[in-house]
């Protein structure tokens, strides 16, 4: 039974002017920084110097101890669920550059809030993104991501990401599947 997400809470307001690129990762050592693809996020920021980038979730260590962060990257600490919702709602792109990942909750929550997804082609990430954003294999693909970010994306793209998660992972569908498996 798949994970489910509450589309009523993780909502999207079409009137909000969305900007920037966001990623979220809880990390406690250099290994996690690499697994979560923060080095690729940093490299992408270097290729898009006029766009703001945000890393959410810094924990026991400072990511800047391990990466020479680009000046357009802001690192903020762990956020509450409501704070994450507000960040997602105001952000245009969500980056999930993990090298090892199941089905990322933060990616699905961001897509429900209208973020256009950018993700690596590992495990559950392509299944979540489908054709609503852009998928990449390696650092060599970053130029394609730059073109994608600079393209003219409108409300349709934001809604498309949201609708995919509702269709595949709506919480009410999960509840129904659980009920059927029990009774």
Language-model regions: role of each:
Residues 4-19, 172:
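Acidic anion/phosphate-binding donor-loop and adjacent secondary structure
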Residues 13-36, 42-48, 54:
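Conserved donor-binding/catalytic core segment of Leloir-type glycosyltransferases
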Residues 63-85:
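Nucleotide-activated donor-binding/catalytic signature segment of Leloir-type glycosyltransferases, i.e.
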Residues 86-91:
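Short alpha-helical donor nucleotide-sugar binding micro-motif in glycosyltransferases
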Residues 99:
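Aromatic "clamp/platform" in nucleotide-sugar-dependent glycosyltransferases that forms part
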Residues 116-119:
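Short hydrophobic beta-strand element within catalytic cores of glycosyltransferases
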Residues 131-140, 147-154:
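Conserved acidic donor-binding segment of nucleotide-sugar-dependent glycosyltransferases
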Residues 140, 153-183:
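A charged, aromatic-enriched C-terminal amphipathic alpha-helix characteristic of glycosyltransferases
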